[in-house]
Regions:
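Conserved mixed alpha/beta core segments that line enzyme active sites in large multi-domain catalysts
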Residues: 244-285, 334-734, 751-754, 780, ...
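Acidic, metal-coordinating helix/loop segments flanking the phosphotransfer/catalytic sites
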Residues: 27-69, 77
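Death-fold homotypic interaction modules
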Residues: 71, 140-199
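Receiver (REC) domain switch/output surface
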Residues: 15, 19, 120, 135-146
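Conserved acidic segment of CheY-like receiver
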Residues: 1-7, 12-36, 47-49
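Conserved acidic residues
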Residues: 67-68, 123, 700
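Short acidic, S/G/P-rich loop/turn micro-motifs used as interaction or catalytic elements
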Residues: 5-9, 54-55, 75-81, 111-114, ...
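Alpha4 helix (beta4-alpha4-beta5 surface) of REC/receiver domains from two-component response regulators
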Residues: 79-87, 91, 95-135
């Protein structure tokens, strides 16, 4: 605004301010949530006042790239306190027009003959003597400066063709506007000015230099504007929890919430990952892989509260009723009606099966994560919306009911949480996967942890570990055979290192969602509509590209890739060894940043789908992140500080982590006249003892020479896992004349990791560790035979293992 009359600018400025604020409140409703709304309000246009010609030119030069428009008087001084120049305003307009032919100008004057100059420079004219000057000013500013709705006009008659209220409407109408009208607006920068006034600076700045002079093709312009808007909306949607609005949720939306309560543990974790991927550009660097989270809508905890109260469910829920009774009551209850339309909108956008996951307040909390206590249901996508709605609401009620099932109540007690503090949010998410006939499943699912307590070879504890499987992730949670590897050493995989192990210890079955089961009999088992299939079925579906290898029984060899005949072995060889898909690299990034931003070790669930075409591309979806907190895993003590006279066993090369203090027994192989030729008999004897421990529900420490579980009886005692399954710590002790390289328990590796068993290697005669056999020999034996001795103590022997430093000790009883 250029004006030197105090009376005039005292009336113009408040008038403009009122107008601008009202506008910015209107367009801030487009923002996705409260945070973005505030940012939008702050991005409103600013009003600057100049009182002289020099000041005006100075301001124009400084801000000329961001000016929405200029309002000027005609008579005002050239310099401060100078003489008034009768045509200063006209000269200003001429100077500005030279620089920018399109910026809107408004001339206001009390001398009506200046109207002629106004038309010469394409400016609007306002008569200061008019009674309705304020109203005129508002109208002209609104029409010319890009405020209000965007109106497409016919350039010849200036009548309205179309009206656009927000970005989504503009995106939808772009290709429908007639070419001449479109041309009229882009050649005058109207689109970018409208975006500026609505505080959408990135798009506006991108579009401003693209004028008719620089690109003379209407359709190319439409395309550029469309793509810019789509990119902007995607950028704005990623890493943000938007408020769910029916008219705004479309395929560019990523994460929205219904309700105002908490998102719960998993919901927060998802929002956290989404934000993390957005802030680290490295995730964008893969040509054939996209990293994302599935489309998600969260029903916040206040929906749960409302559901429980309006249906009077607390009484049944908190009683000691059977689980299925509770479930029946919940299924009869009604969800709030306003959700129906929201769900329909969601179905239209997602068009794939949905997973309904629990996200409770206490789940994945930093100190006592609750994992796997509540139910997760999956439902197929149906064309019949109402049928799908019925399944969805049943699933939501099923998840709500599972808060009050027996197991959850017991778990609550065990972790000293109060059940009425537990509230449940529900996550609705597209299921990651491809459809194969009546089945639906991803190419791979997995769980990655940023700590590895069983590092073998040159792996390091902090490099983390990944368990990978074909099909839905429930297979992993249920303890199926998965492929385990370190993301930094994807070429070294123990399970596929020897053919015999590869055939025995790789995945043979997988889970898929049954698309035919419409869930009429909703049950407490959330896996009721999953199929457990043999890997052969996936081969028929053509889902094993890049994932399987083929066993050739004639040459006794496993070949990477799919070949006719021969059993298919799930090795993920092409992905891990030949890097067809950058899975290992993505996992390195995810674990690195996840741990960095949570400031503690994390566990991440993910799934990936490979495209059906042969172009080797795929999408990697992050499903969940939770901090790793195990009471076992809080070991802060320095084990090297404990003196040798207090320990029974000490190993400087141990696997496993944690503290155990409920072991009272040690079984050890006597070393006095030991000879490897008796190993087979020793194995049978251990099996008998182990059975007694299993029957009594007790555990023990097992010590013996050489490699446990070796199939070569000269290298060690040939036990199988079931024969020693009650042992919590297994020790390989070398003898002077019988020294064996540590096998690190490779024969039972899967079992060691899943049961958290410690594995020590000690060569005491070489000063590598401590093994106080004299102390054991001095104790009375419960059972003694030619080769074995079993000692029981009144007080427990405490086991402490530090997985990061590979140290382990067993203390003397009572220490």
């Amino acid at each position: 605004v250029v004006e030197d009359g105090i009376r005039f600018y005292s009336s113009i400025l408040p008038n403009l301010y009122k107008f601008v604020l009202k506008q910015s409140q209107e367009f801030s409703t487009e923002a996705l949530n409260a945070h973005q709304r505030t940012l939008r309000m702050r991005g409103r246009p600013k009003i600057v006042l100049a009182r002289t010609y020099e000041e005006a030119i100075g301001i124009y030069e400084k801000y000329k790239n961001n000016i929405l428009g200029v309002i000027t008087d005609v008579r005002f001084p050239r310099v401060e306190r100078g003489e008034k120049d009768g045509l200063a305003g006209i000269k200003l307009c001429a100077a500005i027009r030279k620089e920018d032919p399109f910026v809107p100008l408004i001339i206001q004057s009390s001398e009506s003959e200046n109207a002629l100059y106004a038309s010469k420079y394409g400016a609007a004219f306002i008569d200061k003597n008019s009674k309705k000057m304020d109203v005129d000013l508002r109208r002209i500013v609104s029409d010319n400066f890009g405020f209000g709705d965007f109106i497409f006009r016919n350039p010849d008659t200036l009548e309205e063709i179309a009206r656009v209220k927000n970005l989504k409407e503009l995106q939808n109408i772009l290709f429908a506007v007639p070419a001449e009208s479109f041309l009229y607006h882009i050649s005058r920068n109207h689109v970018s000015r409208w975006l500026y006034s609505r505080a959408m600076f990135p798009v506006a700045e991108f579009l401003k230099p693209i004028t008719w002079n620089s690109l003379q093709d209407v359709d190319a312009h439409r395309k550029i504007i469309f793509e810019a808007i789509v990119k902007y909306r995607k950028m704005k949607n990623q890493g943000v929890v938007a408020v769910f609005k029916r008219d705004r949720f479309d395929r560019y939306s990523n994460f929205a919430r219904i309700g105002d309560g908490s998102l719960g543990g998993k919901g927060r974790g998802l929002a956290f990952i989404d934000n993390m991927v957005k802030h680290h550009p490295e995730f964008e660097e893969f040509d054939n892989a996209r990293v994302a989270i599935p489309k998600t809508v969260v029903l916040c905890t206040d929906v749960f509260d409302e559901f429980m109260e309006t249906n009077n469910l607390y009484q049944v829920a908190l009683s000691d009723a059977e689980d299925d009774v509770i479930l029946r009551y919940f299924l009869k209850a009604k969800l709030p009606d306003r959700l129906v339309e929201d769900f329909f909108t969601f179905f239209d956008v997602v068009k794939s099966p949905l997973a309904i996951r629990s996200s409770s307040l206490l789940e994945d909390s930093h100190y006592q994560p609750f994992a796997g206590i509540y139910n997760t249901y999956m439902i197929p996508y149906l064309d019949d919306k109402y049928e799908m709605l019925r399944m969805l609401s049943d699933a939501i009620k099923g998840v709500y009911a599972s808060v009050y099932f027996r197991d959850s109540k017991a778990y609550m007690q065990a972790t000293s949480n109060v059940i009425d503090q537990e509230k449940m949010a529900v996550i609705l998410q597209e299921v990651v996967g491809n459809q194969y006939g009546d089945r639906y499943y991803p190419s791979m699912s997995g769980v990655a942890r940023s700590l590895n307590y069983y590092p073998i070879g040159d792996e390091k504890a902090e490099e983390g570990t990944v368990n990978l499987a074909l099909g839905l992730g429930k297979y992993i949670v249920d303890g199926g055979m998965t492929l385990r590897f370190s993301p930094y050493h994807p070429h070294q995989i123990l399970q596929t290192s020897e053919m015999e192990i590869a055939l025995k210890e790789t995945q043979t079955r997988f889970y898929a969602l049954d698309l035919r089961n419409a869930g009429h009999d909703f049950s407490m088992d959330d896996g009721f509509n999953l199929l457990k299939l043999h890997v052969k079925e996936a081969e028929k579906d053509g889902a094993l590209n890049y994932i399987a290898s083929t066993y050739d029984p004639y040459d006794q060899i496993i070949r990477d890739g799919l070949y006719p005949g021969g059993r298919k072995v799930i090795t993920f060889a092409n992905i891990l060894q030949h890097d067809v898909f950058p899975l290992a690299r993505i996992l390195q990034l995810v674990l690195k940043y996840g741990e960095q931003e949570m400031r503690r070790p994390v566990e991440i669930e993910f799934a990936a789908t490979m495209s059906r075409e042969q172009d080797k591309s795929g999408t990697f979806y992050l499903l969940q992140i939770r901090p790793i907190v195990d009471t076992k895993e809080m070991l802060d003590e320095d084990l090297t500080a404990i003196p040798d006279d207090k320990v029974l066993l000490r190993s400087n090369n141990s696997l496993g982590h944690g503290i155990m203090n409920d072991i009272y027994d040690v079984i050890y192989v006597k070393t006095d006249d030991y000879s490897a030729s008796h190993n087979q008999e020793i194995a049978w004897e251990i099996e008998k003892l182990n059975q007694q421990f299993l029957d009594e529900g007790r555990n023990y420490v097992l010590v013996g020479p050489g490699r446990w579980g070796s199939s070569d009886t000269w290298l060690g005692i040939p036990v199988k896992w079931p024969h020693i399954s009650a042992a919590r710590v297994i020790v390989e002790a070398g003898l002077t004349n019988y020294r064996v390289d540590p096998s690190q328990g490779t024969h039972f590796f899967q079992n060691l990791t899943s049961f958290g068993v410690g594995y020590f290697t000690i060569n005491a005669f070489m000063n590598d560790g401590v093994y106080d056999q004299d102390f054991l020999n001095a104790q009375p034996a419960v059972h003694e035979s030619k080769y074995l001795r079993h000692v029981h103590f009144e007080q427990p022997v405490t086991v402490k293992m530090d997985g990061k430093k590979k140290l382990g000790i067993v203390l003397l009883p009572g220490e």
